[in-house]
Structures are given as C-alpha cells and as structure tokens.
C-alpha cells in the first residue's frame, strides 16, 4: 500500500533581492516574514517504510553543495530587474539556471528539484522606470516545482555533467497538464533547489533533503516585458535572439538604399512600406470601378439592348474606323 506525502517547507524571507535602483523603497515595503510553501511534488512511499520519519537515514555520508555556474549573467539582469515571461502554453526561462554540484556520494542516486517561491505577498507594476507595489498579491495554492527529468541519477553523473533546467517552462495557466510551473503575473519569485537522495527503488530519503537558493535568480513574472532595458539585455545575451540584434542596423541600411538609389525612370518612384493602418484602409475602402470611354459604354448598351428586344443593329463605322480595329458590335454579331 502506498501513501501520497506532501512535503511542506518553511523558510523566512527578508527584503528585496533586486537592485535598489529599481526598488528604491524596498526597505520600507518588504519587512521580513515567514511563509509556508508546498514543495509542489508528491512522493509515493511504502506504508511499511521508515521514510515517514525524517530523522532516519540510510547511513550514506555526503555533503551536497550547489554553485550557480552563470552567476555573472544573472547578476547582469539583477541590476535592471529580471523579468520572466509566462504564457498559457509555457515559456522557457532566460537566463537558464545552470548549476554545478559537488559533495555527492558517487554511488548514490539523487533527485534534483527546482521550486519557485514567492518572495513576498505583494503585486507589482512597472511605473516611471521602477517597479512599485500595486496591492496585495494573489493567493497561490498551486504546485510550483519542477523535478529534473534526468532524476534520479548517480552522484557521479550529476557532478560530472552538472544541472540545467532548460526544459522547465513558466505558465500562467492553472489548468495546464504539461507539468509547467504555474506563476502569477506581476509577482516576485526566487527559485530554490532541493537535492534529495533516493534509495535503490527510486524513492526519496527525506532525511537527506538539502535546499539551496541564490539571490541573483530573483525575478518578476510578466506576460510582456515591461522594462526596455531588460528586453535589450535579453536580446544581447540570448543566442536564440540574435535575429533581433541588428534589426536597427538593417532598417537604417534599407532606408539608405531607398534614399541613395534613383528611380529606374522619371515615372517610377521607390516603393514605400505601408503601415498597418494604410493597408487596412485599402482593404476596407470602396472598390474602384475602372474608367471606360463613353463610346465604349454606349456600344455595350446598344449591343445588350439588341439581344433583349431584337432590334437590328446597324454598324455605321467609317472606313478609317474599320481600319483601326473593331468594336463591341463586331464581337456580338449583327442580325
């Protein structure tokens, strides 16, 4: 028989970990408090096992330690206030969380978990270049953890290859079934990382649980970037955003080509890119009727009328007109 155990973690958090440049009143707004958060993952344990008692251990001696590999990159974002996009389908984090592990027992298996913790109970908004408090934060009872898909693995494997959470996605959809981390927009979070040793059957040994966190990884969840500085920082550092880096240069080059390249003829003008409003105006404007000469219109009217009332049509063209071509009557024939 198996039971589902929900591990509850409690930890106190103080004031902001963001730069005071973007949270100038942080000292007064965020007094220390203690909160209880769910680890966000249920583990199945045999009813007869000793895992219910956190004091019991398997006798393995280890000293887990975690280092944030890309600390400098995270620090760069911290200076301008890191923002992470959340979507209903889920969005990957950037910067990625990359960890280096040490002090693990080489022959024991370990499970690595990333959990998102609310830094405070407040909701924020970006105003006048700074994040300010907009009110009381929303209640967040949903799981906010991501178990690394390679878990459990041996301590030797973790220490050799390290850990990254590139597969973790952030979402604002509480009904998603894809295992995404569900967060509230305009709330502040900081991930913490749990290392727990597993037995031969893959079940975690709770007594071995160790937790780590880094001040540099704090961020605000948003549905769209609020700070232009953050947007530029992500474009400059994200290898998948290199297509956006030279967009201004490309635009300037195209404008210079239009200005410097003369038209092919006096009647030809350089093509000007239309705006969205101009395109919509053309799409929804009244259709234009092509202009026809009065002579051609009268020929059509006379020809159509003759087919209805069967009035003979006399073709009274001069010899000069016949040489120049034929009219509508010639196409329809005469009676």
From Swiss-Prot:
Gene name, Swiss-Prot/TrEMBL: tbx-7
DNA-binding residues: 73-246
Intrachain S-S bonds: none
Assigned keywords, A-Z: DNA-binding, Nucleus, Transcription, Transcription regulation
GO MF term (any one): RNA polymerase II cis-regulatory region sequence-specific DNA binding
A Pfam family per the record: T-box
Location in or out of the cell: Nucleus
Keyword Disulfide bond attributed: no
A cellular component term, taken from the record's GO annotations: transcription regulator complex
SMART domains, alphabetized: TBOX (SM00425)
Name of this protein: Putative T-box protein 7
GO biological process: cell fate specification; positive regulation of DNA-templated transcription; regulation of transcription by RNA polymerase II
Keyword Transcription: yes
Species per Swiss-Prot/TrEMBL record: Caenorhabditis elegans
Predominant subcellular localization, coarse grouping: nucleus
């Amino acid at each position: 028989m198996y039971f589902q155990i929900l591990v509850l973690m409690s930890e106190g958090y103080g004031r902001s970990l963001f730069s005071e440049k973007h949270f100038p009143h942080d000292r007064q707004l965020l007094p220390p408090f203690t909160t209880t958060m769910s680890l966000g993952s249920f583990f199945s344990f045999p009813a007869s096992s000793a895992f219910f008692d956190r004091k019991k251990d398997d006798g393995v001696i280890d000293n887990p330690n975690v280092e944030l590999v890309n600390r400098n990159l995270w620090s760069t974002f911290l200076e301008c206030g890191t923002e992470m996009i959340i979507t209903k389908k889920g969005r990957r984090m950037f910067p990625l969380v990359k960890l280096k592990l040490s002090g693990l027992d080489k022959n024991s298996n370990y499970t690595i978990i990333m959990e998102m913790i609310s830094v405070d109970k407040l909701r924020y908004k970006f105003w006048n270049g700074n994040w300010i408090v907009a009110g009381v934060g929303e209640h967040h009872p949903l799981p906010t953890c991501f178990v690394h898909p390679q878990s459990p693995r041996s301590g030797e494997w973790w220490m050799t290859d390290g850990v990254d959470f590139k597969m973790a996605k952030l979402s604002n959809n509480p009904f998603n079934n894809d295992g995404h981390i569900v967060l509230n927009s305009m709330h502040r979070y900081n991930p913490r990382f749990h290392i727990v040793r597993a037995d031969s059957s893959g079940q975690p040994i709770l007594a071995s649980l160790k937790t780590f966190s880094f001040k540099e990884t704090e961020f605000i969840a948003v549905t769209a970037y609020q700070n232009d500085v953050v947007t530029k920082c992500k474009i400059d550092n994200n290898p998948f955003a290199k297509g956006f880096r030279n967009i201004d240069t490309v635009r300037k080059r195209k404008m210079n080509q239009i200005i410097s390249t003369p038209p092919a003829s006096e009647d030809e003008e350089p093509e000007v890119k239309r705006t969205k409003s101009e395109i919509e105006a053309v799409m929804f404007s009244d259709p234009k009727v092509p202009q026809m000469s009065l002579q051609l219109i009268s020929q059509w009217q006379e020809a159509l009328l003759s087919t209805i009332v069967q009035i003979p049509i006399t073709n009274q063209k001069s010899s000069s007109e016949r040489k120049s071509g034929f009219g509508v009557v010639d196409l329809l024939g005469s009676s």
